[in-house]
Amino acid sequence: ILIRGGSQRVVDEAERSIHDALMVTKDVIEKPALVAGGGAPEAQLAYEIREWANKLSGREQLAAQKFAEALESIPLTLAENAGMDTIDTQVELRAKHGEGKIWYGISVMDGGVADIYGKGIFEPVKVKEQVMKSATDAASMILRIDDVIAAGKMKETKPPRPGEEGGVPGEF
C-alpha cells in the first residue's frame, strides 16, 4: 500500500488508520463474529454485575461494584469524547439497561444513547475478548496482593535539650 500526503504527519496518520483497519479485518477473518459496539456490552455487564453485587456484602460487594464502574467507564469515555454530558448519559444508559434494553450504548454519530445493534454498529468479538481479558487480568492481579505496605505514623521526636547530642549548649 502506497501512502502519500501533504506532510509527514498526514502520512503517519493515514498509515496508522490503514494499519488499524487491516488489523480489524484480520481479527474478523480469524474469528468471524461481531458484537455490538458503542459500549453496549460493557453497559449491560455493568448493570448485571451491579444487580449481583447487591446480593453480596463486605469487600466482595465493593469489589464487584468497582468492577462494574470500570466496565461502565468505557461507554462513558465514548460519550465524553463525543462531547456528551457524562452524567446525563450515565443516567439514561442505566435506565435503558434497567428496562432490559441490552443493546443500548453510545451512538457517537447521533450524540446520544441509542440501540447500537439496531443501528448496525459492531466490533470484532476477538478485540472485545482481548480487552476484557486484559482488564480482568489486571484487576485480578491487584486483588491478589496479600500484603499492603503501609507507612506507620512517624514517631514524634522532641527536639534535643541543651547539652544533649544534637543540641546547642545554652539554647532553650
How would you describe each model-predicted region?
Residues 1-172:
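Extended, low-charge hydrophobic alpha-helical regions
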